[in-house]
Amino acid sequence: MEVGLPDNNITLAVIQARMTSTRLPGKVLLPLPFPDGEPLIFNLINKLKLCSQIDQIVVVTSTGELQTPLIHFLNSKGITSIQGDELDVLSRFVSAIEQFNPATVVRVTADNPFIDIQKLSQTILFHKAGNLDYTRTEFLPYGMNIEVASASSLLALNKREDITIEEREHVTMKLLNCTEYKSHIIKSNEVDLSHIRITVDTPQDYMRAALLHQLQMNKPLDKDLNFITNTYSNYPYLFG
């Protein structure tokens, strides 16, 4: 579905982030590695900057005073942020699209600090080559899969009268489930690695991520998949 494609080939990474996580409040500013590393979200941003296929990065968060520490940190680093409705995440993406006018959007969540840059680049290129509305990966570790969407499809979603509150919150749900959109799922690994949990949702997840970042120091930051699979092979109990 093509609706007013921008006259450029800009790829925008949109990071969803908020300070009000139910299970681990303020996690986006917790240090990686512990105790004196950079905030989780800054580690994530620095990794995204390694991807040559990404032109711009923006953080979209919700409104309210609780987000102030995050906004202040992003401002101090010169990182653009946009605030909007907490539950209507799609509207925040639309605001980012209207500000940056990209052709392609990479959806990133701030609780997933591990990204394989090679897989990310491959997914973006595949999405563009296929002129797809939505592309996602599977078979990567839990918290490493990638989502790419055309900006025009997200703008079209925002105008639909039949979109539900849940679909506005989860942004890409309708792109995958609605046959009107041209979507594709890439099996990014021969073996399903989804049992390897590397997302950060709980204190235990954070402790694991902090240790993994400590182990990753002095190793290539653009090869997270190799690092995670090697670490899992050597220390499987870390991922239990």
Locate predicted features.
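A short, N-terminal amphipathic alpha-helix
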Residues: P39-Q56, K77
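Conserved core of the sugar-phosphate nucleotidyltransferase
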Residues: T68, F114-I196, Q204-M207, L211, ...
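Hydrophobic targeting segments
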Residues: I10-I15, I41, Q56-V59
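Conserved acidic residues
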Residues: T11-L12, D55, A103, D133
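Short glycine-enriched, charge-decorated loop/helix-capping segments at active-site entrances
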Residues: V28-P33
